[in-house]
């Protein structure tokens, strides 16, 4: 361990001492972690007053007070486009985590984690003398926030360290787990991120308790702030409330499961998956099964993987509900300064060990909670169950006439009956789950195999393609959920080949600037930085389901792809071992279009292009999982419209955040795409120019022109008509995704830059830079080579 471990233990021991949880903390915080903003917000200017030094809610310092969003809550927010900038990284904007990880003594880290598991600390004693269960839960809850629908959540950025996740009710006491592994993080420093360490710790815990994992891939770089782009829900309360909006106020627990608001996967605000006591706290195992199937399905898990994760994960550890929740202090984000980032102070006894309180449930699933076994399914299926209350008052189940031989976590002379959660009993109250569970009861080796694969998937779901996986334990086997790509065939094309191919593309009948740019952008903007899925590498726009998305204009797309395939065939058949992929040609077609449009506008520029993309097969493409990438609206190509919960421009900003675009990059890309006439359907909506196909800043010039007045052409405010103020003649048609660049103060400020005289060349250069960035977002192979 690190040399400073002894001082760390001394400081940590202070946690066992009585601590005031109110002084200097948030006076508006409630025990469940929410805030009662209705309380009087009185000023406390004098040190002798009881409220001096506490949170004023609306401070009179920088960032405090009533903000613009308080006055105008419907104002389009661009905050998510300013997240995670290199300048915010304390390691430096050019820090290369992948390079640092390669110098890590990986086996030494694993050895230190294994040793820590049985080094029980007085300030937070280990259940059964082993932190294995706690560490598995930490990893599970870090990775388990992932949602397949939008790719957000997950453990890829180490977000469990930050609000709101660090203070979610379902993450109670995981703050202690992270503090337990801090000496290891401190020892190895920048060579391993928090994101990797939290997940690796869970993996090592499984191995140390006798389970054979599939392996582990590192490569998750840390972030340094809360990810404000994730929609966790619109509720203002946490579980056991906190699900009125996501279920549209439905309380029908038997019929509402699949009505859960998209893209959410959890049944309550503040939960990772489902309420373990049952839907809305109702101990109904059959109804719980419906919630489980929906929740796990929305994170990309099928029935087999779901049962494997529950049965495998619950082979270890226990839940905690030894005392009433009224004895627990506020979550970390509302706790006292003296708690130093910890929360949930327990006022009973030492506040830990036998008095530990987390979920309120007091359940031990197996007789060997620190050793891999099939004991979970044996107990679940072979016992009869009756509903009881935990010491904290929560609904749980106890074996009827069960044997009293389940170990106490702290007293080796005491034993208990078998216990289960309502969500556990769901596995024997659902026909499909029961079938799987009974099979594995008789064939535990199949459970071990299924759990190893499901656990690996859970931890790596948002890590992206295997080219990003680092370390000596990356398995050779690939899985369809990793969006596998084939090895590149033939020799790579060179610069001379690129020039010949661009000329061939531009001279091909049926291909023009608008179609080429639209196709390339449609292909590339499927990328999601949240889980590193999508993008043009693989040319999956030519496969199901993408080739038939309405947003991709299937008829036009088919014609463009056929023409590009002809160019591909001609080149590959006459250039020896050199081969060009369809994926490269799609991007190269857009590149050629941009260069031509710039030249036709009077600016000679070479658009950077990096060959080496490959073409995936239909067999390598999970149609269901890729269907989640289909856009509701696409502001870059003027497709679609908003919903009852999100305006068109908000969807555009959401996509821009997935593409890691800044506000200027978003602005110049949209303006350039309109100049190219690259709408999905070839329409002139937003094409504010008489020079369609030329890369001019006309979109901005005409958008900010006060001689043009805009009026909505429908009640929904999606379509707009621009007319000449004097002649009253119609000049342009626009969408919300167009007009927002003239309406929104910050976006207009950027638009005006490109509308100013003398900035034509700047506009082209900025567009090319943003274009190239988007085209290469999924080129992790280039980053590995670098």
Swiss-Prot record:
Enzyme class: oxidoreductase
Catalytically driven reaction(s): H2O2 + AH2 = A + 2 H2O; 2 H2O2 = O2 + 2 H2O
pH dependence: Optimum pH is 5.25 for the catalase reaction. Stable from pH 5.5 to pH 11.
Residue location of crosslink Tryptophyl-tyrosyl-methioninium (Trp-Tyr) (with M-299): 140-273
InterPro entries linked: Catalase_peroxidase, Haem_peroxidase, Haem_peroxidase_sf, Peroxidases_AS, Peroxidases_heam-ligand_BS
UniProt-listed GO biological process terms: cellular response to hydrogen peroxide; hydrogen peroxide catabolic process
Catalytic center residues: 141
Known function: Bifunctional enzyme with both catalase and broad-spectrum peroxidase activity. Confers resistance to H(2)O(2) in hyphae. May play an antioxidative role in fungal defense against the host-produced H(2)O(2) (oxidative burst) at the early stage of plant infection.
Family: Belongs to the peroxidase family. Peroxidase/catalase subfamily.
Record protein name field: Catalase-peroxidase 2
Organism for this UniProt entry: Pyricularia oryzae (strain 70-15 / ATCC MYA-4617 / FGSC 8958)
Origin organism lineage: Eukaryota, Fungi, Dikarya, Ascomycota, Pezizomycotina
Primary gene name: KATG2
